[in-house]
Amino acid sequence: EWYQKDYQSFIEYNITDVELVDKLEDKMKLIELCLTMAYDAKVNYVDVLGSVKYWDILIYNHLRKKNIVIPQKRKNTKAEKYEGAYVKDPIVGMHNWVMSFDLNSLYPHLIMQYNISPETLYGQQKVKDMTVDKLLDKKVDTSILKGVTLTPNGALFKTDTKGCLPEITESMYNDRVTFKRKMLEAKQEYENTKDPKLLKDISRYNNIQMAKKISLNSAYGAIGNAYFRYYDLLVAEAITTSGQLSIRWIEHALNEYLNTLLGTDKHDYVLASDTDSVYITFDKLVNKVFGERQDTTKIINFLDTIATQKIEPFIDKSYSELAGYVNAYSNKMNMKREVIADKGIWTAKKRYILNAHDVEGVRYKEPQLKIMGIEAVKSSTPAPCRQKIKDALKIIMSGDEKMLNTFIQEFREEFMKLPVEDIAYPRSVNGIKKFTSDSGLF
């Protein structure tokens, strides 16, 4: 109807749409991301939106180079549920001097470490009554493992030859490391020079490394999908339970290390942990070294040194012990410091704010808020409120209670005067006809 009655405005509206998409692509480069993934895997563009067809073709091309014929697809029953990732209940509240440590590409590295692949699985029989807790407490005698490695769900994988999945993921990961390094170098240069040309370089390098990251992480999802050619519940669960073991292993090890270092007993220094990260408070260490004379820059430099020279080597040693204990194909767990924050607040699982001064070696002149799961980053929160929540969080980090109360009261008055279209958001309502019609109301 619009097309027929007002052709000119219809055309103008569509031109505006095209311009907006072009601007979004110039900044986000999402189309470029899809194209990068499609060319990498030799798939159609639509296939990058899922993991099943994408990885089916990746594996086919990899095996074809080796003159290996892929198996026929089997009709699988509906996929059963299996164990997921581990997320620790956080220590709720505000904490000072927090550092986070992140495992690089956890699931792909678990595939490499345990040589997880359809053809390396040692039969469908599991080791009975095997759990993450038993391996954490070293209640399992693993000295009998010869030519196989053990995962916490009881699956065994051969270690005499490298599987096709570890080969593909290792190649992808090496490419990702290259482009992520280029992205971080460009980010640091931008922080120093503020040259706007660098923003496009950052976006381009980020998209290439993201293409690799998405491809790597989707391998595990494909294996657990009943429509995948190489679907195997035992293999998928081997990956997730091995991830649980890795993050809980290092949580226990770091707590023991810091309790010994600081002369405390059973104090929990790990504030929170999720699939591939741990968040640790170093407040006691900072107070012990600096006392009341606390210079922010000196403390950040000190914590950076502690992370690289003490914590990371200890983590490497701990993960080497784990790899030896389960007779892994190789030790691929690589955990590095991500964030240094002077303050962090947790409200629940995966809901936190960090006042970050340094992220992955990129030092900020002014601290940046790293927000996860808080209303300030939720699209369902009205835009004016999202910005004000962020402003309020900055006051929480650097101001006092009086400043915060004043800010809230001022915005309360401002909010009441805002037009409804600025603070409303679309939501559907069910059953309007049922509850408003004369026949159905009573």
Describe the residue ranges of each PLM region.
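Catalytic micro-motifs at enzyme active sites that drive phosphoryl/nucleotidyl and oxygen chemistry
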Residues: 86-88, 265-270, 323
